[in-house]
C-alpha cells in the first residue's frame, strides 16, 4: 500500500542537508551554510517547530548581531519559515503582543512585557535579543539558544549570552533541547573586519560515530512513522496497535541519542540549487565578485598579509549606537529602512560620499562633527545593476 496525502500526511520538499538535520535533530546544530541555502527558512524553522512541540511552556532566546538586522531580516525570515511549515500568525503563535490567557497559563515562567517576544499556543516563548541591545534579555534564563549570522558575533559576547542558557533543569533537564544551541551562518572570512572564526572551533563538539548512529535511528523512526500512517489510512486496528508500539520504541531510542549530541555541518549554496536555479550561479560567477568561494562555496579563508592591518582594528574604532531603534519600533518587521534611522545624521550639515567603482559599485556616506568622523551608511549594487540603480538607492534612502 502506498501512503496517501491527507490532513495528517503532507508532502514537503527540502534539500538533502536539511533532511539530515531533520532526521537527526540533535541537541546542538552548528551549520556553516552558503548564502541562499535556506538557513533560517528551513534549517532553523524545522528546529523551532520541533522545539515548540517537545518543550511546551519553555522560554527560548533568539540572538542576532544588531537590532536593525533583527527587525529587517531575521524576524521576517522566521515568520516565512514557519508559514512554509504550515504555522500561521494568530493561530499557532503571536508576536509583540499579549497572547490569549489560555496560552499564558501554560508558560513555565512569567513574562510581563511582550515586545520582541513570540508566544506559541502551548506557552513556548521566543525572546529576540540583539547583541547591540542585550538589555532586552538581561536577567532572564532560557532553555535553549537560536541564532543566525553568527560570524558577526564576537566570541566574548556569545560566551556572555550563553550563560543565560541555564534555566529550569527540574522541568526540562531530560529534554534534548535543554541548554541546546541552534546556530547558523555563512563562512566567516578573517580578512573582513567584523567577521569572527571562533564558530569553527565548535566542530570539536561533534562525535561522528554518534551522529551516524543518530541518523540511522532517525531513518528507522521515519519508516516506523510511515508504516503507522499507512495503518491509519488502511483502517486496520491490529496493524495500528503494532505499528504504533514499534514507532514509540524508536521515538524513545531517537530521543535518547539526541541528548548531548552535536551536528556540525559545512555546506555550499549548491545544496539549494534545485530552488535557486542554474541562472543564479551563472550570474554570480559571471560577475566575478569577491567572496564567491567563501559566501557561496563555504571554503575557509586564510588571513592574507595585506589584510593584517585591518585585524588590528578594535572596538574603539567603531561606534555601536548608529541606529535609532525607536524609529525602527514605529514600523512593521521587514520595513525598508531610510535615513530616519541614522541617529547621528545632521540634516543641516553636508553629507560626504565616496565611491568605489568596479563590478560591485559601492558608496559610503559620512559626516564630521568636531574631531569625530562617522561613516553612517553604505549603499551598493551588484551586476546587472549599474550607476543608475546606485543613484536611485541613494535617493530612496536619503
Describe the function of each predicted region.
Residues 1-29:
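Pre-P-loop entry segment of helicase/translocase ATPase cores
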Residues 28-99:
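Conserved P-loop
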Residues 71-143:
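Inter-Walker segment of RecA-like/P-loop motor cores
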Residues 148-149:
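Walker B catalytic acidic pair
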Residues 152-272:
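ASCE P-loop NTPase helicase motor core
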Residues 259-260, 266-353:
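ATPase catalytic-site recognition across NTP-hydrolyzing enzymes
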Residues 342-370:
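Gly/Thr-rich phosphate-binding beta-strand-loop-beta motif of the actin/hexokinase/Hsp70
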Residues 347, 365-398:
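Nucleic-acid-processing active sites and adjacent nucleic-acid-binding tracks
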